[in-house]
Amino acid sequence: MIISAASDYRAAAQRILPPFLFHYMDGGAYSEYTLHRNVEDLSEVALRQRILKNMSDLSLETTLFNEKLSMPVALGPVGLCGMYARRGEVQAAKAADAHGIPFTLSTVSVCPIEEVAPAIKRPMWFQLYVLRDRGFMRNALERAKAAGCSTLVFTVDMPTPGARYRDAHSGMSGPNAAMRRYLQAVTHPQWAWDVGLNGRPHDLGNISAYLGKPTGLEDYIGWLGNNFDPSISWKDLEWIRDFWDGPMVIKGILDPEDARDAVRFGADGIVVSNHGGRQLDGVLSSARALPAIADAVKGDIAILADSGIRNGLDVVRMIALGADTVLLGRAFLYALATAGQAGVANLLNLIEKEMKVAMTLTGAKSISEITQDSLVQGLGKELPAALAPMAKGNAA
């Protein structure tokens, strides 16, 4: 199969993976309206083509939290990467490290902090959920600090799990889920051999280390379901801000007032995100939410964005809408499931090439030159409601 875009990796991953795993990463909440709009709204953002600008000295490099990035992209936190490729978190981290961008380890990773951090030269980022078990949160933070993690990404848009109908249909949850997953695994031999057998242990490493016993998929679902905390408020985050002495990023912002609260709280960054359309269906796409948030806090706090980003053109669009850096989620997971570290490395190369083309043809020699002026007036900043119908194609 010829791979020329992230969509090719998605098609390949669907063939390789058991359905319960493919649909777990590919699906969203409820009817998946927001999930589809993430991609469609971003694709409708029109860039201004400019010509004869002498683009010979183009550079994608940028700086974030005193870290030099080869391009304004990081691999965002994605749970269960180690179920998509053998020791998947390590493979993805190595690809990011080689490309000169950050890798973010999820709380619910298969590979624990202590396995991933030593595998790369660059300090990784660590993502943490708001959980009832504050002992686990403190333990995870202590381990992340000890491993040299540079930035904490604190996810706040999950006080309760979203309702994901695809999971019940695919076997990730629902009646006879364990048996359905087993039958799917044995009929997908490439995955069964590479990950199912040779990718063990399939513990949730960060949770197992705390609980002192193995935690499989059923344990993961049960433990997390019992530990999400709907009572959380900004005040509950104060001890984390005091404990963590590195940059702290609040992930899950869609409203300008919440962005202002993050500035008042003292966060170093925010992620404009709807959790890839996996939490509340019907909320704004990140592309629609981003311009108003940038108007409210640009310059006061670092603005990251995710959800719907599939290629280098999308990266340029998000930056023009107001982001400083973007996070990749599904895009790199498709590549990881298809070809491991090599797949992620190739995806990052594709994104870099696509960014260079977009910047060359819009007259932006550097990341700082990608601004609202790079957008066609009326299509980028405002994103009117009639701009994009609900998507019928790929997930966000």
Curated annotation (Swiss-Prot):
The keyword Membrane appears for this protein: yes
The protein's name in its UniProt record: L-lactate dehydrogenase
Keyword field: Cell inner membrane, Cell membrane, Flavoprotein, FMN, Membrane, Oxidoreductase
NCBIfam families: L_lactate_LldD, PRK11197.1
Enzyme class: oxidoreductase
Catalytic activity reported: (S)-lactate + A = pyruvate + AH2
Pfam family, one: FMN_dh
Residues binding FMN, per UniProt: 106, 127, 155, 251, 306-330
